[in-house]
């Protein structure tokens, strides 16, 4: 890897258009002098934005005429959209012209293209989608979030190893790992979970903390929570929905009458701190763990602040050598 870290950005695939990625890249470069970013997308739109934002010698542009839309079938996109901004961004990793890639595009297409071009690490059966979740103290890493619907016990064990490696890269010396289940008792759950539990219990490369229920995901009792992609995605979407529901209810209640508005004014400093701590933008950027280079999936409707955080995740994974750490972890088993 070169001394200057290089990030390829799919500038076209997000819901809000290329302006978000362009502004985020410009601002992110101002904070990191050892970084270069290549924005990939329609040349005319990128050049127009370039003229508005000014020149930066560490910001580059690569023309890609096509775009992978959210409606595109992943396999169809893989076969027919090799001139898209998503494909060309990943191609920069494949050609060793970038160290990480960030895209806000179609998750299935991004995963299919990444597996085709970047390949998985030796010993990794399938990549998993992983995201940091805000908890009472710090974060907990939850995986898989949708890449693998039907998994066996060996794959869950592999997810645990990858999640533990990511937690170590974030500074957790001895990661605590749990399996998501419908109960904490050892006899609860499917046969796959029972078999996976045996594998995790016998692995001394991390601390296995037993089963964890969904209502304790945010307690901060463990550092890594492992599950199949179906249940992980349901847990993630449910938590996002509940968070938005609570925020909306608080806003409505504080506007109900004069007294509640006074209470809102008095509580504003506390509410502001809480809003900042739980701001989804601070946790944007899901990782495709198990690939040979970091590929980060930004939320499709990410604003500039959220996209900057996805860039931060990409930068940290390169700096902390996350793929290499995963490979080292897997090679011991």
Swiss-Prot record:
Pathway note: Lipid metabolism; phospholipid metabolism
Listed EC numbers: 2.3.1.274
Entries under InterPro entries matching the protein: FA_synthesis, Phospholipid_synth_PlsX-like
GO molecular-function term, one example from the UniProt record: phosphate:acyl-[acyl carrier protein] acyltransferase activity
Pfam families for this protein: FA_synthesis
Keywords noted in UniProt: Cytoplasm, Lipid biosynthesis, Lipid metabolism, Phospholipid biosynthesis, Phospholipid metabolism, Transferase
Compartments where found: Cytoplasm
Any one annotated GO CC term: cytoplasm
Domain of life: Bacteria
GO biological process terms held by the UniProt record: fatty acid biosynthetic process; phospholipid biosynthetic process
Annotated catalysed reactions: a fatty acyl-[ACP] + phosphate = an acyl phosphate + holo-[ACP]
Family statement: Belongs to the PlsX family.
Subunit and partners: Homodimer. Probably interacts with PlsY.
PANTHER family: FATTY ACID/PHOSPHOLIPID SYNTHESIS PROTEIN PLSX, PHOSPHATE ACYLTRANSFERASE
HAMAP family: PlsX
UniProt function note: Catalyzes the reversible formation of acyl-phosphate (acyl-PO(4)) from acyl-[acyl-carrier-protein] (acyl-ACP). This enzyme utilizes acyl-ACP as fatty acyl donor, but not acyl-CoA.
Name this polypeptide is given: Phosphate acyltransferase
Natural source organism: Cellvibrio japonicus (strain Ueda107)
Native organism taxonomy: Bacteria, Pseudomonadati, Pseudomonadota, Gammaproteobacteria, Cellvibrionales
